[in-house]
Amino acid sequence: MKNPMLRIALHEIRQILREPRFLLPFLFPPVLLILSQMTLLSAEMPPEILSRMMLFCALLISPMTVPLASDSFAGERERSSLELLLLLPVRPSAIFYGKLLALLPVPLVLVVLSETAYAFFSGCFLFSLWWKSVFAGFLACFCFSGISLFVSLSVKTARAANQISLVFVFILMIAFAALSDFYFRISWAPFLLALFVFALFSAVSAVSFRKFRNG
């Protein structure tokens, strides 16, 4: 593969998949939610409750991009390997966007798998609820990844990056929950939310890259 950005992204993804401490937070929330569905809740739920539970399942996974993003740059700086990374014979943009690209595949795949599993075990698969929940999970992953990456570039340790990023995650989780009724009720709401999230993600990514390039 000749594209350096894709090579860096694939290397980062392989590192993520080799690290159980990064994978376990992605796996536990949907498993626990599905088990609670099977043991505590009734098999048949009204669509209103099911939509909230499926959205909750997606939102439990998406913040797990925070430790990945925190380790991307703050972790590299803490291990004194960021300077070595910048000495690679590739453009800074390839390093930055390769690392950014590597943050998304694992959580996005797990959002789809967990939402599908939850819908299956709930005994009430409604495609309209499924795709909207998956889409909300995707948007939350992009949102949390962009903000966490910016924080990771602004602090010196991965722990500090995690702690600061979780404040933003808490605020955004409240916003997603508050808008859930509007999101599921209005047909064009997902597309409006997508425009906002991708505009935010693009702006934060551009500012983060400038910060990375300027050191």
Regions picked out by a protein language model, each given a short descriptive name:
Residues 1-22, 213-215:
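N-terminal Sec/SRP start-transfer signal
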Residues 40-51, 114-138, 142, 185:
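Membrane-interfacial helix-loop-helix connectors in multipass membrane proteins
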Residues 90-120:
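Selective transmembrane-helix segments that form parts of the transport pathway or gating/packing helices
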Residues 154, 198-215:
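Junction motif at the cytosolic side of a transmembrane helix
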Residues 178-194:
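Extracellular/periplasmic helix-loop-helix junctions in multi-pass membrane proteins
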